[in-house]
Design a protein with these regions (language model features):
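Bulky hydrophobic segments
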Residues: 1-98, 104, 108-123
Length: 123
């Protein structure tokens, strides 16, 4: 298995743990407070943290499984919805459309970035 695929699976697992944990592991590590979520940049209409997380993970997934990119895109869209719906039943978490929009926007941005990279590489 290529190193990019191993990296993708490890980051995907870490992402799932952080996303499904009841509270913020990063908030606990940085602020000693499970209820405080670190904010990379201010939110606009969507959650910027979710955009960054899904964008980075999607880029790694698309690079790792380039020949199956359609399935990777479906996986991340499905994962976006399922993880956000799971927040309905996880203590100290809540379903928010702004988070869901941020998740999907991160996937879309990663697709755009990859397509630009491919286009510029063909010139």
């Amino acid at each position: 298995m290529k190193i990019t695929k191993i990296f993708f699976h490890i980051t995907n697992l870490l992402f799932l743990i952080l996303y499904l944990f009841p509270g913020s592991i990063l908030g606990f590590l940085l602020y000693n407070d499970l209820s405080k979520q670190p904010q990379v940049t201010p939110d606009f209409i969507f959650s910027s943290n979710h955009v960054y997380a899904f964008c980075v993970l999607s880029i790694v997934g698309l690079i790792s499984y380039y020949n199956k990119k359609k399935y990777v895109i479906y996986y991340f869209i499905f994962l976006s919805v399922i993880l956000e719906v799971c927040h309905l039943i996880i203590p100290n978490r809540s379903f928010q459309f702004s988070d869901l929009f941020g998740n999907i926007l991160g996937v879309v941005i990663s697709i755009i970035i990859l397509n630009i990279y491919i286009y510029l590489g063909k010139k």
